[in-house]
Amino acid sequence: MYNLNALIDRLIEISINNNLIEDMDTVYTRNRLLSLFNENSYTPCEEKLTLSFHETLNELINIAIEKKIIENALYSKDIFSSDIMNIFLPTPSLINKEFYKRYAISPKESTDYFYSLSKSSNYIRTDRIAKNINFKAPSKYGTMDITINLSKPEKDPKEIALARNSVKSNYPKCLLCIENEGYEGTVTHPDRANHRMIRLDLNDRTWMLQYSPYLYYNEHCIILSEDHVPMKIDISTFKNLLSFVDKFPHYFTGSNADLPIVGGSILSHEHYQGGNHRFPMNDAKKLFDFSIEGFEDVECEAIKWPISTIRLRGENIDSLVLASDLILKKWRDYSDETLDILAYSNSEMHNTITPMVRKEDGKFVVDLSLRNNRTSKEHPLGIFHPHEEVHHIKKENIGLIEVMGLAVLPGRLLKELEKIKEYLRDEISLDNIEEYHRPWALELKKKFDYLKSSTDLNDFVNKELSNKFVSVLEHCGVFKLNEEGLEGFKRFTNSLNS
């Protein structure tokens, strides 16, 4: 085991290099770290370590376990590592002052500062994110982004039992609330001692900007309401999204829908997501264009995308807000029984929108994906939700990130796809493959046996996985991209002028 003093010196050295602290802070920081380890003396160590940041942090955690300061459990180790890094961080007020000092130079400089801080403090878990499998694969709608999510470690049975038997707390109320800032964490609530948020004013309401601890794309940020209020999509949503992009034109932002099945995993706290990433949907081609009376300064088109989406372009924020609100209100009450679209069932609302905003070539671009959460006997999880035949790949809600063409697929697929590759190479029998994958594996075998002389196996499986994800998205489209669906889409856009 490494010497504690040498590890402390190494972590301080790394943090100075990462601009978390300055040389002047060395003695103070060292003493605060010694206190965490119940030590009250320090002897300089001749041994100079060259460990990486995460290696150093992990070795410090091992010493804490050895000294019985913490348990050898994931939640306990995470809490302790956040306590360590919190020592290196300024208070929220100082971070906000620095952010806005840099914002006066440029919006990008301010987000670069906060993003770097969030990584250097280990709030963004870059070590775990690096485990994800990411690749791009072609599809009939363009190149899709595929991620197999391996970043979130699994809890062991002991921790699961501890969580099940622990006393439930309503503080913080949810994973997003402002009360998470600096929160120690428990077996049931993640560590947040090293968590900081930037205060934003969007349309006379206070919002918080933070980065996601488990990024799915570059600079994946979350913009959350200061108040714990439910998700909603209305005119204020469009005002907020456009206001955010106006303040940070190098970022996109968007919102999950506000209804179950088609919404995200957290409906209880109003929030948006954003970041510095170009998604496959951004490059979707025009399906047809149309106009809306009274909005001559707004370009309107439907795009060729599996989830039915209207794209608006313009320079005037007020016009885009009002045009988006008109489309939302029309869609809320729109029914087309020939396409299984019903706005209400016994007063239960079914129609909503997943909106996204970005700035491109001097204009704001607003994408409005039309969603419906109705269920049926044939599709009890949702008519416009991934159907049963694709559940072996993805059965969870299709939220904002997936709508834009980035698949976030379960970690189990990593081993399961390797088995399928072994089957395609004739190394194992079909019986060795999970039962829910077998129909797909048989289908792939027929294709690959025909193509294998000219096709790389990994590329083939990646492309077929991408095609399966496209099917997931197509199931969610309210206006299918066939003649009947296209006519239905045009009926809806025509109704915007009635």
Swiss-Prot record:
Tagged with keyword Methyltransferase: no
EC number: 2.7.7.12
Pathway the protein acts in: Carbohydrate metabolism; galactose metabolism
Catalyzed reactions per annotation: alpha-D-galactose 1-phosphate + UDP-alpha-D-glucose = alpha-D-glucose 1-phosphate + UDP-alpha-D-galactose
Keywords, alphabetical: Carbohydrate metabolism, Cytoplasm, Galactose metabolism, Nucleotidyltransferase, Transferase
Disulfide linkage: none
One term of GO molecular function: UDP-glucose:hexose-1-phosphate uridylyltransferase activity
Localisation per UniProt entry: Cytoplasm
GO biological process, one term: galactose metabolic process
GO cellular component: cytoplasm
Enzyme class: transferase
InterPro entries cross-referenced by the UniProt entry: GalP_uridyl_Trfase_II, GalP_uridyl_Trfase_II_CS, GalP_Utransf_C, GalP_Utransf_N
Listed PANTHER family: DUF4922 DOMAIN-CONTAINING PROTEIN, GALACTOSE-1-PHOSPHATE URIDYLYLTRANSFERASE
Family that this chain belongs to: Belongs to the galactose-1-phosphate uridylyltransferase type 2 family.
Protein name, as recorded: Galactose-1-phosphate uridylyltransferase
